[in-house]
Amino acid sequence: MGSNLPAQPNLRVTIIAADGLYKRDVFRFPDPFAVATVGGEQTHTTSVIKKTLNPYWNEMFDLRVNEDSILAIQIFDQKKFKKKDQGFLGVINVRIGDVIDLQMGGDEMLTRDLKKSNDNLVVHGKLIINLSTNLSTPNTNQANGLHRSHMQPSTSSGLVPQVSASTPQPSPGPSQADPTASNPSLHPQRVPSTTRPSSTIVPANGPPAPPNGQQGSRTNLSSFEDSQGRLPAGWERREDNLGRTYYVDHNTRTTTWTRPSNNYNEQTSRTQREASMQLERRAHQSRMLPEDRTGASSPNLQENQQQAQTPPAGGSASAVSMMATGATTAGTGELPPGWEQRTTPEGRPYFVDHNTRTTTWVDPRRQQYIRMYGQNANGTNTTIQQQPVSQLGPLPSGWEMRLTNTARVYFVDHNTKTTTWDDPRLPSSLDQGVPQYKRDFRRKLIYFRSQPALRIMSGQCHVKVRRNNIFEDSYAEIMRQSASDLKKRLMIKFDGEDGLDYGGLSRREFFFLLSHEMFNPFYCLFEYSAHDNYTLQINPHSGVNPEHLNYFKFIGRVVGLAIFHRRFLDSFFIGAFYKMMLRKKVSLQDMEGVDEDLHRNLTWTLDNDIEGIIELTFAVDDEKFGERRTIDLKPGGRDIPVTNENKGEYVELVTEWKIVKRVEEQFNAFMSGFNELIPADLVNVFDERELELLIGGIADIDVDDWKKHTDYRGYQESDEVIQNFWKIVRTWDAEQKSRLLQFTTGTSRIPVNGFKDLQGSDGPRRFTIEKSGDPGALPKSHTCFNRLDLPPYKTNDVLEHKLSIAVEETLGFGQE
């Protein structure tokens, strides 16, 4: 071939950049360099670019070629060049005559997918080069002393890898790189935050994340346009830290996965946002806790009971209403023997039972209906027991019966300084057919809310905000007041909305709107997790806002304020965040919601022999605002190799760094605000799953929607096991359903549009039930994939027993 080559160089090859290279090491980025060869006779090498998956060289090489010449360009990791595989990262083979006419001349920009070599190592990414017959301009490499060429045939096969000068190999599968990479930007401007779009604007499914840290291809388009043209006024295109494209609407300070249409209409967009917000508001207002579920403030429970129960014989509609609310009927006729009616100085009637020498607010002629938890004949979880107060006898020592302002009976235990809806003279409704975890949660809740530190102080705390400026106004109002003032009765007033509310509906609306605003990724304080696009985690790059620590303290105060005043926030965090709030140690399982790829790599490291396969040290590479630095996981860590003996310690330290250490400043600021209202020793009575419910409440889950958007593997919907599964779920109350949702998906959060929008770690992922496991084993869950591994249990009773144990007794969020 050499005899057919011209005597002088006739083609200039510019190796511009590579994009989205494969990251073979868990925490170490490669040091890429490129080697260009023609027929094994001419070899040129670029400089080494340190610690990157997207190296930029822009180096020129002049070659002697003909139309049949094969140009081969390989990329290697300089750190591993002396290893067996030489740190191979990919190759392209280009036949010169296929891309440029040497006789006519020309200039061609090429973007080619990197291919595998003969050893079949995994390869990702693209290589961008330029071929030109114009050699009249000076070679900038030669001018800068960077041109390292070997014009004679290589005699050292160990120095430069041998390349098969054949036609390009077929791609091993669909290209993993961004198809828009044909016009790469050589100096892309990256937004320093790694935020992700909020699903609260236009609920949409984000595309799957590129695998193994691959970033989307950079183009020479500005951030205000994309391949479809220029974005509407006020819109910007960004990319999150998983390479997913999202769009920022600066007009409304919101984000979305969905590209705005070219005929974007602000009025239409506003209407869509309002409709979406109304759906979320309705879902938020339906959330409750177990203690609330026994009260008249639980509309969903009342509705369910009205459907599940019929009035007693001879009963009326008012009797059904009484059963749903726990109220009493008006007494008529004479008082029973030994009873007397008296009046307090304030004019309130009460009744004296001289038979037992006790007093009560309740007219003994009234009939009280007591709500009892347990299984009835129909298999429902709630039954109503009718019991005349006069037949119950006296209250135990130290107990008192009182009425709420809606005439509902409750009981005060002065021995423990607690209150309860449950009549102590009846068999405990907490212990009849109620799962252990539920007894524990309800008792914890009663204990928690009865503590002196959680009692509302005398006086009022006035907060006035504007709806369209709620974040800034709330920050100013809440941060100017002392913690003791915030513990007074909270009176929320929206500017321009006069009316007497006593803080009830306004408080609920206030926390709903504020939680939507302050957790919006637009502000770079929080970002959506790797698991989905609706659970939150602290943004490690929140320092882009110089006041971020003050804002985290404010957010901590708001979360504490919501718990203190028994309101819910419309936001849900990764499981590890709740663990951190309880000062619990995070584990490898918690990594699933933060970085699914890293979780998989670390799990593989623990389960396999790594000697001679993976070269790691006790150090990690971290990039912050474009600067990459090496962080020691322990003193001198970068010089300590990871071995089979110490890999367990390595995994623990990596997990601690990735989840806790990177956001330690922000989290400590958050907790300083939170603990001003909620003492740490009190909140620690809950576990992490209960804390999620305490902050966000328990959702009213639509089982029909859940079932409709479920896939099956190994099962069919008509199988008896599946029929029994849904039958059991329908009989469970809202809390048990939320626990099941936590067990299988990692959160009790349901997307605004229902289960059809359920997300996994790799994009949209429907709830899935897979036939897996021995009938003697418990069900298992894969929270990253919203999957439940359900063994083929023989009977309904066995299925319910096994499922209940798995859901109730399992700690943590991820099971695998």
Swiss-Prot record:
Main subcellular localisation: cytoplasm
**Which pathway is recorded for this entry?**
Protein modification; protein ubiquitination
Going by the entry's taxonomy, the superkingdom of the source organism is recorded as Eukaryota
Range of residues in the leader sequence: none
Annotated EC: 2.3.2.26
Q: Which processes are annotated in GO (biological process)?
A: intracellular transport; protein ubiquitination; ubiquitin-dependent protein catabolic process
- HECT domain mapped to chain residues: 482-816
Reaction(s) this enzyme catalyzes, per UniProt = S-ubiquitinyl-[E2 ubiquitin-conjugating enzyme]-L-cysteine + [acceptor protein]-L-lysine = [E2 ubiquitin-conjugating enzyme]-L-cysteine + N(6)-ubiquitinyl-[acceptor protein]-L-lysine
Ranges where the C2 domain occurs? 1-112
**Which ranges are annotated Low complexity under compositional bias?**
310-333
Q: Respond yes or no to whether keyword Hydrolase is given for this record.
A: no
Where would you find this protein in the cell? Cytoplasm
Name the active site residues. Answer: 784 (glycyl thioester intermediate)
- The annotated regions of Polar residues compositional bias extend over 151-168, 177-202, 217-226, 253-270, 295-309
Q: Does the keyword Cytoplasm apply?
A: yes
Q: Where is the composition biased (Basic and acidic residues)?
A: 279-294
Where in this protein does the record put region Disordered? 134-238, 253-353
Alphabetized UniProt keyword annotations: Cytoplasm, Repeat, Transferase, Ubl conjugation pathway
Q: What positions does the domain WW occupy?
A: 229-262, 333-366, 393-426
Q: What general EC class does the enzyme of this chain belong to?
A: transferase
Pfam families (UniProt xref): C2, HECT, WW
> Which molecular function term from Gene Ontology is one that the record holds?
ubiquitin protein ligase activity
Functional note = E3 ubiquitin-protein ligase which accepts ubiquitin from an E2 ubiquitin-conjugating enzyme in the form of a thioester and then directly transfers the ubiquitin to targeted substrates. Probably involved in the regulatory network controlling carbon source utilization.
Family the UniProt entry places it in: Belongs to the RSP5/NEDD4 family.
Q: Tell me, how does this one assemble?
A: Interacts with creD.
Q: What is this protein called?
A: Probable E3 ubiquitin-protein ligase hulA
Name the gene for this chain: hulA
